[in-house]
Amino acid sequence: MRKIAIYGKGGIGKSTTTQNTVAGLSEMGKKIMVVGCDPKADSTRLLLGGLAQRTVLDTLREEGEDVELDDVRKVGYAGTLCTESGGPEPGVGCAGRGIITSINLLEQLGAYADSEELDYAFYDVLGDVVCGGFAMPIREGKAQEIYIVVSGEMMAMYAANNISKGIVKFAEAGGVRLGGLICNSRNVDNEREMIEAFAAKLGTQMIHFVPRDNMVQRAEINRKTVIEFDPAHSQADEYRTLARKIDANEMRVIPSPLEIEELEKLLIDYGIAA
């Protein structure tokens, strides 16, 4: 089983990218579990047809310790298994701790057992803050492979660089590696070239450039992935291509994060900060 975590700054399109990629992989016959590690609990919505899933933390709060796997795991599009860790009540507690609690519970309940015959476990992780809890999938070796969703916008690249620093910190102990950058385009000038250059400086690859298309929003309004909503659309093929590239990817690196001056120079060289 490959354990993959998707990181990236808030609002960059991590959950959308993850769910569409998972839909592409499940079309290829892969068995996948998606674990949402974001207090918003929107990491599985499109796979479940908009069904608001009861989170692990809510279930624990309401049921106590007496929880079955089916209480916290739902079956979504093409047989994908969907779980949301959820978060604490606003203003109380630490969302990062919630992720730790959730993943530990899933392990205890046998969600990762060989009998489940999983090909992939995907963690969709809130990514601006590489605080202890959110870094947990990396730190504890729960995920071995990281993909960072990025765009040509300054804050997205800044967050990606920070996440890379987190990977370096835990790479030696946990064996975690960076698999590549996924560029979720915002139609910034010279975006593709800039992210390719950024990836090269980090020592990794831009595994795929996902063009911006309103079909993504249209599918989301209909509570579906693009692959389910309009399978013949060119955007569905983009996600299928990304899924195939991830499935075939053997590049795993410990990244070399940039100094802030280098990052700013990159932005200036490609015209965004001019």
Curated annotation (Swiss-Prot):
PROSITE patterns: NIFH_FRXC_1, NIFH_FRXC_2, NIFH_FRXC_3. ATP binds at G8, K9, G10, G11, I12, G13, K14, S15. SUPFAM superfamilies: P-loop containing nucleoside triphosphate hydrolases. The keyword Signal does not apply. It catalyses: N2 + 8 reduced [2Fe-2S]-[ferredoxin] + 16 ATP + 16 H2O = H2 + 8 oxidized [2Fe-2S]-[ferredoxin] + 2 NH4(+) + 16 ADP + 16 phosphate + 6 H(+). [4Fe-4S] cluster binds at C94, C131. Binds 1 [4Fe-4S] cluster per dimer. One of its GO terms (biological process) is nitrogen fixation. The key enzymatic reactions in nitrogen fixation are catalyzed by the nitrogenase complex, which has 2 components: the iron protein and the molybdenum-iron protein. Belongs to the NifH/BchL/ChlL family. This is Nitrogenase iron protein. It comes from Desulfatibacillum aliphaticivorans. The gene is nifH.
